[in-house]
Amino acid sequence: MTQTQPVGTLRLTIDDQGPQGQSRAVEQFHQGALRVIRPHYLDDSGQVSYTIIAIGGGYLGGDVYEQQFTVKDNAKALITTQSATKIYRTPQGPVTQYTEINVGENAVLEYLADQTIAYRESTYHQFTKVTLHPTSTFVMSEQITPGWHPDGKHFAYDEMRLHTEITDSTTGRLVLLDNLLLRPDSREGSFGWTEQYTHSGQMIVMGEGVDKQLVAELNEQLAAHPDVYGAVNFLSAPGTLLRGFIARTLSNRTEELINLHEHIASLLRGRWRGQEPVNLRKY
């Protein structure tokens, strides 16, 4: 992924050959500042759940992290984090995280991370490459929270860049190329950028069950939400059967964004797989 020596490396490969058809890790490698807690099964669906731990309490300037997740055909996995990712001052250069994700035929991956907290004078670059089979289900959510500032300033970080690519594994066609770039200092005030809101979120869902009716339903729910502002957009591309949606949201509280993302994930897992709602059991 990168020629720079990473501070933390994590690789997981998951199949469905465990006892009673449970999904399990057949390859697990970690080095440096990244670890995973022993797997859990949060319901009787056979979906395995892994929690990522970042040793050290926060990311520092110049740090590079690499993650690779592979979910083989028919396997089901949920990956989350133990706590928020904290980006401190980065005078030595940006913090960079590379993630590669591969999800096979009829496989499921829900990647529900805690918030990323960007403190003053910090720069964070995240590059995520996702390769999906058209019959797979992929859910990814993330939240960006401005860190504490002694002067009470909301947007004291320098730059946040979230670059995401999604490709069809059967045709090689690109379905999504998204580059979310936040540079608070390039804006005078918040008008036209985040209005009165301080926290931002995004959720990407790919699956056979996504259609324009579902997108319209989610937009109606967002419009009625008293504490979150946002929109959901349908994703598709010529030459591929992959389809999905991306939701962009704003709020003043991290919990509102996390609760919304977990609500959507629970709604879809219930409709598509008859599975119980998300319950990460962190608190």
From Swiss-Prot:
Keyword Chaperone: yes
MF GO annotations: nickel cation binding
Localisation: Cytoplasm
Protein name: Urease accessory protein UreD
Record's subunit section: UreD, UreF and UreG form a complex that acts as a GTP-hydrolysis-dependent molecular chaperone, activating the urease apoprotein by helping to assemble the nickel containing metallocenter of UreC. The UreE protein probably delivers the nickel.
UniProt organism field: Corynebacterium glutamicum (strain R)
Function recorded in the entry: Required for maturation of urease via the functional incorporation of the urease nickel metallocenter.
Family: Belongs to the UreD family.
Gene Ontology CC terms: cytoplasm
Presence of keyword Cytoplasm: yes
UniProt keyword terms in alphabetical order: Chaperone, Cytoplasm, Nickel insertion
Region of interest (Disordered), ranges: 1-20
